[in-house]
Amino acid sequence: FTWADGNGITDLAAVPNVFAGGSWINILDPAYGLPTVRINEFLASNVNTNGLRDEFGNLDDWIELYNYGANPVDLNGCALTDDASVPGKWVFPSVTLAPNQYLVVFASGLDRKIVGGTNKLHTSFSLSTGGEYLGLYNAESPRVAMDEFAPTYPEQRDDYSYGRDPANALRYFSVPTPGAANG
């Protein structure tokens, strides 16, 4: 926030929200933190005919999220991006992840946010096999990275996923496990 005598408060959002002057009380919650969701695994070159397919039968790239916390997390307004300068590139609809739940989002470029039935989530971008930035951002303004592969993730291999093992170390997986624990 910026403060100006007699002029109220203006936040630092891209389109500023101006609040009228008057009496204000600002309370910070010391228990507040970022949501407990991370990018757990992704596959940037899904070419094997036995690989995970979307609802159209396509072998698209995919990103797996995992809620490692003890409470459900609503992803509404959170975002995935392949460009650190555009943290809100693809914004989630209201989708809640229960504790220890996984969510697979296809990185197909189709930009689909309708869930239910056979509909799956699809980002507005696909993943580069040569390595690029990949980030998950909170819904607040300004956006803060909840998890990211920065400055870039390493070069990817056909049908090998990349992500966190049970010890939280980053590595390749010859047997991808979308929607399940990594081995």
What role is predicted for each listed range?
Residues 1-183:
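Intrinsically disordered, low-complexity linkers and terminal tails enriched in Ser/Thr/Pro/Gly
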